[in-house]
Design a protein with these regions (language model features):
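N-terminal acidic, glycine/proline-rich low-complexity segments
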Residues: 34-362
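Bacterial Sec-dependent N-terminal signal peptides
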Residues: 1-49, 362
Length: 362
């Protein structure tokens, strides 16, 4: 028989024990919260420390024929507003009279009127927007610092000036047209801008070249490769730093433009170019336009992952502009291989194309 005294003792013990358990649980909870806060703060500090520095980019575009160049330029400025890239220059490889005025008005719209612009002065292919009429539509609606492409300085001079001012091995060149300017840059001589010749200057200042060019592993004729075949051959054969190729097959299924037209800023030149062009060829653009140029810029700004993998080797061009690939694990060339679904890549790209500009005064 348990005595009354013993029962009272046990009851008191249990009450004390429960209080002790509660105190232990509460203490553990508070400690966990405190540790969690410390962990988050540490993570924030680490994130701040490892935050990527804006990638210095020279953007070389034909901005003629296909209007994906306009989409890529909108995307370029969106990435700059996000702090992911630093736009050093926007250069035309296309001497068509309306190209430089169009480049200028896009830069102005996005609040960057002072970005250097260059245009080729040597003979090369000239192409306007043909029956799509997006050049003249843009020029009629938006202010530009240029009336004609001839007013812009020589592309090679702009390249040499910009490169000479940058840290060594820092610049990424993104070309989304034919590569006449890059051939001419390699052939340029020492001058008052730099004591280095073109190839030496590229080797010293350029980290990599990302090109929308060719088709892989081989393609008979891709527009940018055949537009100036001699320039294509010379530039690729003599380029002293790594080259990444985004082939025709990468951009063709990355369809953009329809959401931009429906939901994009009504005053945007990027939206206007697509809104003017897509209805002109309803069968071709039923699901939007291919994002050939945008995929090149995406990789230049954000790297391969999670969008693409790549193959390493050597890009080989022929006299007629057809392209082939020689696999070589030690090669300096890479071409993109699809990894993320094209629709997912398209959504990310088109979101950038729909960007509303900040009031930047760079």
């Amino acid at each position: 028989v348990v005595s009354i005294k013993k029962i009272k003792y046990m009851r008191g013990y249990l009450l004390k024990s429960n209080k002790l358990v509660c105190l232990i649980i509460i203490s553990f909870f508070l400690l966990s919260c405190n540790n969690s806060g410390r962990s988050d703060n540490t993570a924030d500090k680490k994130t701040t420390k490892i935050q990527k520095k804006a990638i210095p980019i020279i953007f070389d575009t034909d901005l003629g024929g296909d209007f994906d160049d306009v989409g890529a330029m909108g995307m370029l400025h969106a990435l700059a507003d996000k702090g992911e890239v630093n736009i050093l220059a926007t250069i035309s490889c296309n001497p068509s009279p309306l190209v430089v005025p169009s480049i200028s008005l896009i830069n102005i719209y996005f609040g960057r009127p002072k970005i250097p612009i260059g245009s080729p002065k040597s003979p090369t292919r000239s192409q306007d927007s043909r029956e799509l009429h997006y050049h003249d539509s843009l020029i009629a609606h938006f202010p530009s610092a240029y009336k004609n492409s001839d007013e812009a300085p020589d592309a090679v001079v702009v390249y040499r000036k910009v490169l000479s001012q940058q840290p060594d091995s820092s610049v990424t060149i993104v070309s989304v047209g034919w590569v006449t300017n890059l051939r001419n840059l390699l052939l340029s001589k020492p001058d008052s801008i730099s004591p280095l010749d073109g190839k030496e200057l590229v080797a010293k200042k350029v980290k990599s070249w990302v090109a929308m060019l060719g088709g892989f592993p081989e393609r008979e004729k891709e527009a940018n490769a055949v537009s100036d075949t001699l320039a294509t051959q010379y530039a690729i054969d003599n380029w002293p730093t790594p080259i990444i190729f985004s082939g025709y097959e990468i951009g063709v299924d990355v369809k953009t433009g329809l959401r931009l037209i429906k939901e994009g800023p009504v005053d945007s030149p990027v939206r206007m170019a697509y809104a003017v062009s897509i209805p002109k060829r309803p069968k071709n653009y039923k699901y939007g336009n291919g994002s050939y140029d945008q995929t090149s810029l995406l990789v230049a700004a954000r790297g391969f992952e999670p969008y693409y993998s790549y193959k390493t080797g050597q890009f080989i061009t022929s006299d007629n502009g057809s392209t082939k690939w020689k696999y070589d694990p030690n090669g300096r060339h890479k071409y993109l291989v699809e990894k993320m679904a094209p629709d997912s890549v398209a959504f990310e790209i088109e979101t950038l194309m729909m960007h509303n500009p900040k009031n930047s005064t760079e």
